[in-house]
Amino acid sequence: MDCIPALKALGEETRLRIMRLLFDDQLNVTQISERLHVSIYNISKHLRIMTEAGLLETEKSGKQRLYRVADGLKHQMGRDLPVLDLGCCTFRLDRFLPK
């Protein structure tokens, strides 16, 4: 993974909250929007940036597109501590729970 685009993509609190939300689940834009109380328009922009940076993968399910954390980036430490491993650095996602 190229760390610079990934770090740029993670340099915004809403995107870190999205990563935390998607760490354990696959969700569509509407579900993410509802859980984070952020407009669908803004969530869509964040998801595009994160997908282009290689942080997220998508899967088509009917008319919906489901988003998830990219394979190989998810790690668990200790007791269910979600950690995002970019190769160059790691992020503890437990601090970025949906509000």
What are these regions (language model features)?
Residues R35, I40, S61, P82-D85:
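Generic detection of intrinsically disordered/low-complexity segments and helix-coil linkers/edges
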